[in-house]
């Protein structure tokens, strides 16, 4: 990715989010190697888990290694089920200097039967200043999604986090393979849903953030 950026006329991608297993004893060594790349900004680790006792956010080794994110001044992309949000809040509060980015709109899959639960989770976690929200991934869990369906989530997310702490993303090619949706269809829906935003607000959620 760094090679691609170096050769691109606009230096895209201008930021790289990598992976390090924070439960691994070599986590610090892996992070040090990543730091050699100019555009490296943070890591992403999938923490989705429906078994509370096995949740990595309760693992002492994982929590100890998480201090490395703070040490290297990196961001952390957090992918969880929204039912895990209270554990996530505990972790986020422990590391107030780390910028957290909640992935895929706090994964609302279970909200089909508990929309109020997802809404509560979004509103509570948005109360933490060091958290931003990435709005994406609907096609990965809702194969027959449509603009009206995802607008319910997007409007609540924007209201909770505000345009300064939200960003839109495509989740491609994963969404393409699962929902058979085109890249353009997601962006067309996003633009339609956010048509009420001012130019500055739209620039924030689609470019600057």
Language-model-detected regions and their locations in the chain:
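Mid-to-C-terminal alpha-helical segments outside catalytic/metal-binding sites
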Residues: 156, 161-167, 178-209
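Active-site gating loops and adjacent loop-to-helix segments of metal-dependent hydrolytic enzymes
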Residues: 36-50, 98-99, 129-132, 182-190
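Short, electropositive alpha-helical surface patch
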Residues: 1-12, 95-102, 152-161, 183-193
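Catalytic pocket-lining loop regions of alpha/beta-barrel enzymes
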Residues: 55-167, 176
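Active-site gating/metal-coordination segments in enzymes
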Residues: 1-83, 90, 134-141
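Active-site glycine-centered loops adjacent to acidic/histidine catalytic or metal-binding residues
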Residues: 171
């Amino acid at each position: 990715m760094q090679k691609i950026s170096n050769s691109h006329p606009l230096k895209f991608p201008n930021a790289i989010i990598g992976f390090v297993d924070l439960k691994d004893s070599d986590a610090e060594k892996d992070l040090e190697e990543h730091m050699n790349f100019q555009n490296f900004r943070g890591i992403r680790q999938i923490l989705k888990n429906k078994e509370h006792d096995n949740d990595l956010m309760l693992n002492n080794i994982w929590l100890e290694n998480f201090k490395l994110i703070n040490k290297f001044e990196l961001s952390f992309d957090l992918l969880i089920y929204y039912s895990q949000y209270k554990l996530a809040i505990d972790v986020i509060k422990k590391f107030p200097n780390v910028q957290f980015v909640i992935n895929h709109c706090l994964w609302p899959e279970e909200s089909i039967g508990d929309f109020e639960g997802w809404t509560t989770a979004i509103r509570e976690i948005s109360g933490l200043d060091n958290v931003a929200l990435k709005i994406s991934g609907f096609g990965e869990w809702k194969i027959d999604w449509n603009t009206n369906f995802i607008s319910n989530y997007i409007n609540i997310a924007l209201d909770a986090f505000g345009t300064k702490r939200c960003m839109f993303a495509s989740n491609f090619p994963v969404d393409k393979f699962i929902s058979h949706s085109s890249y353009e269809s997601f962006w067309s829906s996003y633009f339609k849903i956010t048509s009420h935003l001012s130019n500055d607000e739209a620039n924030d959620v689609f470019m600057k953030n």
